[in-house]
């Protein structure tokens, strides 16, 4: 690169806005300029825009990249996020970046996310656009446009009986310019009952059924499905002892041993499209032991 100079000019536009312009001179490699603008609309909304132009003399390339971040927390637990990343040359990070992880990255992603939360469940939607940093002309890169999901956190279903439930539901629409694309719906309901055995041991059996539906839009109009049964049983206990400190205050020591058995039935997957890790899982027949120690203090 030769002799390098970076000179920045900071402009405090207002209490809620600022901007920075920087000259980036790298001797034999070339020169460029980058601009950053930050804004703070309120405690619930802010963002940042950063862009760079660099004339690379060594590789005869005009490089331009862009980063945009925005966050807004709306009333009633509604949240929105935008994370946009773009480069016009696939080797820009290898040529200009000093961040090792950025220099070796294969893909760069942009996302937009919107979620609505309640006490024990959430509804969300997001889109994901990816660039292949080894070949920007790659038309087989998978794009998620969009994903819609719903998640029910562990919740007691009836007051009169100790029956609990959880649910995860997603719908994805996958697109490629070339290659396999389509849609996928995935639903995983679960039910479990904690059963106290004497006063020291609790056994919790859980059963869930996972149903996945596929529509291969470009290759076939026929839908395919996959079903899988999941079962687990956990036996756990909790030992608690409280200690008083000489100077006042107390601390509590908790020991929580547990044993969990999990079984996931095998499923036919030969005819299932592959978009990401959700589409492939292996049979599970697993026994897990755990021992958790917790210390908490009251001063």
Regions found by a protein language model. Name each.
Residues 1-299:
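Outer-membrane beta-barrel proteins and related beta-barrel translocases across Gram-negative bacteria
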């Amino acid at each position: 690169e030769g002799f390098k100079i970076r000179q920045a000019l900071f402009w405090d536009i207002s209490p809620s806005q600022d901007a920075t312009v920087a000259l980036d001179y790298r001797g034999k490699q070339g020169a460029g300029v980058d601009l950053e603008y930050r804004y703070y609309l309120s405690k619930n909304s802010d963002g940042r825009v950063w862009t760079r132009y660099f004339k690379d003399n060594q590789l005869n390339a005009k490089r331009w990249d862009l980063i945009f971040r925005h966050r807004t927390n709306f009333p009633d637990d509604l949240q929105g996020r935008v994370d946009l990343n773009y480069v016009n040359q696939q080797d820009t990070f290898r040529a200009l970046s000093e961040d090792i992880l950025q220099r070796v990255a294969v893909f760069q992603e942009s996302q937009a996310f919107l979620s609505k939360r309640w006490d024990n469940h959430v509804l969300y939607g997001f889109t994901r656009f990816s660039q292949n940093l080894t070949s920007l002309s790659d038309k087989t890169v998978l794009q998620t446009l969009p994903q819609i999901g719903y998640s029910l956190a562990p919740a007691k279903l009836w007051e009169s009986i100790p029956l609990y439930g959880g649910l995860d539901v997603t719908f994805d629409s996958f697109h490629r310019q070339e290659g396999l694309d389509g849609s996928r719906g995935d639903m995983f309901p679960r039910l479990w009952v904690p059963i106290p055995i004497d006063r020291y041991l609790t056994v919790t059996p859980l059963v869930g059924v996972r149903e996945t539906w596929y529509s291969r839009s470009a290759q076939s109009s026929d839908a395919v499905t996959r079903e899988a049964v999941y079962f687990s049983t956990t036996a756990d206990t909790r030992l608690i002892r409280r200690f008083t400190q000489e100077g006042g205050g107390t601390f509590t020591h908790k020991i929580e041993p547990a044993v969990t058995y999990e079984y996931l039935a095998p499923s036919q997957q030969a005819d299932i499209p592959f978009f990401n890790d959700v589409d492939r899982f292996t049979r599970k027949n697993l026994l897990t032991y755990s021992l958790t120690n917790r210390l908490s203090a009251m001063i």
